């Protein structure tokens, strides 16, 4: 299941996903072990925490890493609220071309940012998504850029990021 709460066609951050009227949806997703992919900005993290606290069995996939800010560089203080989400074991992260090639890394760099993401969340909670065909480039080019961004990661971590995590979230992929 995917919940689109912001994006190119909806630039403002919606808050409806945390409305009490949605609680039956969250209960259903938790009871049926249905992963819920959230496309949202970091400003909605407090609402996401409320949902994860209320429904600790629901599996959440945070799309585009919620566009965590990277321009300040190490130690990525501007992304502190994002990194604080690591305590939620039900939370997984989807890394996309938006994260691999942000418009402005500023003082940040893929090597230092993704190393910190892996240290905080663990590679088994990260999964790569191509965002194809909406991303610029061929699928091969998009994959190559992602592999380059994670070249500092251990091979076993890359195995999780580029396949095993998806198989955990969607067991039919492991068959």
Regions found by a protein language model. Give the residues of each.
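Short, acidic/turn-prone active-site loops that include or flank metal/cofactor-
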Residues: 5-8, 64-69
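Active-site gating/metal-coordination segments in enzymes
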Residues: 1-43, 50, 92-99
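Conserved anion-binding
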Residues: 39-40, 61-65
């Amino acid at each position: 299941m995917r919940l689109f709460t912001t994006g190119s066609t909806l630039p403002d951050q919606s808050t409806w996903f945390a409305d009490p009227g949605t609680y039956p949806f969250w209960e259903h997703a938790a009871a049926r072990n249905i992963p819920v992919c959230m496309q949202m900005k970091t400003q909605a993290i407090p609402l996401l925490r409320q949902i994860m606290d209320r429904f600790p069995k629901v599996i959440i996939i945070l799309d585009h890493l919620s566009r965590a800010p990277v321009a300040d560089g190490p130690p990525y203080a501007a992304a502190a609220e994002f990194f604080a989400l690591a305590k939620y074991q039900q939370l997984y992260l989807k890394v996309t071309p938006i994260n691999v090639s942000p418009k402005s890394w500023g003082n940040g760099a893929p090597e230092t940012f993704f190393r910190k993401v892996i240290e905080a969340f663990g590679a088994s909670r990260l999964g790569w998504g191509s965002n194809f065909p909406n991303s610029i480039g061929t699928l091969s080019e998009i994959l190559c850029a992602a592999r380059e961004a994670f070249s500092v990661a251990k091979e076993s971590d890359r195995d999780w990021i580029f396949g095993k995590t998806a198989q955990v979230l969607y067991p039919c992929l492991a068959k």
